C-alpha cells in the first residue's frame, strides 16, 4: 500500500545481503504514508533493535545541549548495534544558509559529522525534503520518495481495512490524496462509533480526511 519511487520490498531484501550494514536512508514525502513504519519494518528484517529519536527528544534549551544529545543518540545506537531512526529529521538538518542563529548551524554540523562517521545504519524521515541542508543529502545511500496512494492501492486498502467493497459511485478522481494513515484513522473512528459502518459512511469519512489536506479556496474580488 506504499507508493514510492523505489521497490521497498526489494530494497530490504538487497540490504539483508550486504556484507556490511553501513547504509543510510532518507524517507521523505507526504505525511501518513508509512515512512516510520517502513524504517521499523527494515529493522525487523535485519533482526536489529531500534533506537528511535524525535526532535523533541534531542532539542535542548542549553548551549551545546542539542549537539550533546545528537552525539549521545548515535553513541546509543552504536552501543546497541541498533538501527537509528530520526523521525521528522528536518529540524536537525535544516538548510544552514537559512540559519539566523549560531546554534542552528552547530547542531546541523554535529548531525553531519555523526552521519559521516557512524558505523551502523540509520534512517531519517521528513515531510520537508526541500528544507534539508544540501550537504546532508550526500550522506544518504538512498533517498526514497513517498507519495499519495494510487487508485488501485486505495481500492485494495478499503477492502483490507474495512472488509467491504468500495462504493461503486466513487470515481478515480475522488481518490487522489489518500494515505495509509487516513485509512488507519477512519478505522479507529469506525471502531469508536461501534455500530456497523456502511461503505458509504466509511467513504465519506475518508473523503473528509482528504478534503482537510486541500488548501483553502482563495476568494476572488475586492474586500
Predicted region positions:
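Walker A/P-loop NTP-binding motif of AAA+ ATPase domains
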Residues: 2-169
Amino acid at each position: 500500500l506504499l507508493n514510492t519511487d523505489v521497490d521497498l520490498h526489494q530494497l530490504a531484501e538487497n540490504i539483508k545481503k550486504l556484507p556490511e550494514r553501513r547504509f543510510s536512508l532518507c524517507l521523505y514525502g507526504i505525511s501518513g504514508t508509512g515512512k516510520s513504519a517502513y524504517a521499523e519494518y527494515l529493522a525487523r528484517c535485519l533482526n536489529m533493535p531500534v533506537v528511535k529519536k524525535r526532535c523533541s527528544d534531542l532539542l535542548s534549551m542549553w548551549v551545546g545541549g542539542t549537539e550533546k544529545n545528537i552525539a549521545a543518540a548515535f553513541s546509543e545506537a552504536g552501543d546497541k548495534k541498533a538501527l537509528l531512526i530520526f523521525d521528522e529529521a528536518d529540524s536537525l538538518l535544516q538548510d544552514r544558509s537559512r540559519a539566523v542563529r549560531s546554534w542552528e548551524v552547530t547542531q546541523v554540523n554535529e548531525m553531519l559529522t555523526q552521519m559521516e562517521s557512524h558505523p551502523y545504519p540509520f534512517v531519517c524521515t521528513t515531510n520537508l525534503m526541500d528544507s534539508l541542508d544540501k550537504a546532508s543529502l550526500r550522506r544518504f545511500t538512498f533517498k526514497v520518495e513517498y507519495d499519495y496512494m494510487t487508485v488501485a492501492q486505495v481500492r485494495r486498502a478499503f477492502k483490507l481495512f474495512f472488509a467491504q467493497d468500495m462504493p461503486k459511485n466513487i470515481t478515480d478522481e475522488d481518490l487522489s490524496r489518500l494515505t495509509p494513515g487516513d485509512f488507519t484513522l477512519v478505522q479507529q473512528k469506525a471502531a469508536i462509533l461501534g455500530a456497523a459502518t456502511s461503505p458509504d459512511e466509511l467513504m465519506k469519512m475518508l473523503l473528509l480526511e482528504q478534503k482537510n489536506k486541500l488548501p483553502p479556496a482563495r476568494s476572488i474580488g475586492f474586500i
